[in-house]
Amino acid sequence: MSLELCNSTRQAIPNKRLLQAIRMVVQGEGYEIATITGVYCGNRMSQRINRDYLNHDYPTDTITFCYSEGKAIEGEFYISLDVIRCNARHFNVTFEEELLRVTIHSALHLTGMNDYLPEERVAMQAKEDYYLQLLKTQKSISPQKSTDNAIFSCNS
């Protein structure tokens, strides 16, 4: 089992909280981690991936690729910290709260949830709210021991 977070920017991110959020969602939805890579990047990388894979020529908050079909998740996601910063101001929340919400959103995509249709978006937002609140209540609790390999890396 492998869970790797890569921050390719100079913006500090709460690595341990992000790992906790991903694990919480994956386990809470009844899945396990095989290999998950999360890349926290800037707008240039986000726009390039969005253009190359989805034919959308603009940066976006998150792009998720799920390669698994069973209960053991293999996948990766890319989150633009520039978009997160902008959205945090727009929604009047902290950078960290928006980052956690979008990381939870990405993890939900890895478990198979979609948000294409209006009713799917409502269900996705409800799950985001649930896990974000759960994460807030566990803030003072030390993270559980995990058997997966958690790696933090940075490619500047």
UniProtKB/Swiss-Prot annotation:
Show the GO MF annotations.
metalloendopeptidase activity; RNA endonuclease activity; zinc ion binding
Task: State how the cofactor is bound.
Answer: Binds 1 zinc ion.
User: Which cofactor does this sequence's record say it needs?
Assistant: Zn(2+)
List of residues binding Zn(2+): 105, 109, 115
Give the enzyme's EC designation.
3.1.-.-
* EC class (word): hydrolase
Q: Which InterPro entries match?
A: MetalPrtase_cat_dom_sf_prd (IPR023091), YbeY (IPR002036)
Question: Could you tell me the Gene Ontology terms of the biological process aspect for this record?
Answer: rRNA processing
Subcellular localization: Cytoplasm
Give the record's keywords alphabetically. Answer: Cytoplasm, Endonuclease, Hydrolase, Metal-binding, Nuclease, Ribosome biogenesis, rRNA processing, Zinc
Pfam families tied to this protein: YbeY (PF02130)
Which Gene Ontology cellular component terms are annotated?
cytoplasm
Similarity field: Belongs to the endoribonuclease YbeY family.
Q: What does this protein do?
A: Single strand-specific metallo-endoribonuclease involved in late-stage 70S ribosome quality control and in maturation of the 3' terminus of the 16S rRNA.
Q: Which NCBIfam families match?
A: rRNA maturation RNase YbeY
**How is this protein named in the record?**
Endoribonuclease YbeY
This chain's source organism reads: Chlorobium chlorochromatii (strain CaD3)
| Gene from which this protein is expressed | ybeY
